Amino acid sequence: MTSAVDPHALRATMRADLGVAMKARNSRAISALRTAITAIDNAESVDSTVATAPASAHIAGATIGLGTAEVPRRSLSPAQVHAILRAQIDDRSAEADRYETLGQIEAAEGLRGEAQIIAAYL
C-alpha cells in the first residue's frame, strides 16, 4: 500500500472482496479478510476508559436519544493501516513457522496462505 491509498477505500475494497470470498466459500480468504478488517476497526476505536464526571444519582447527567452513546472513531493514516496489516502478516508467518516445527504442515500452509491474501493489500 502506498501513502496515496485512502484507508477507507482500502477497507471498502477488503469488505467487497470478503463478500466475493463468502460467495465462493473460500474459508482461507474469509478468515484473513475478517481478521484484517477487525484489526483495523479495533485500531480506530476510542479509549473507553475516559472518566466521566461523578454524579450523585443513577441517571444524573445522562443523555437519552438515538446516538448519544456514539463517539467519532479515530482516523488512521495510511502508514498506520499499513503497519496493522504488516503486523497481521508477521503474526501469521510466525505462527506458521511454529506450526511447521510442530509438524503441522497443513495448518502452517493455511496461515501462510492467509498472509499472502493480506499482503495483496499492501
Task: Please place each PLM-identified region on the residue numbering.
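Charged, compositionally biased, marginally structured helical/coil segments
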Residues: 1-122
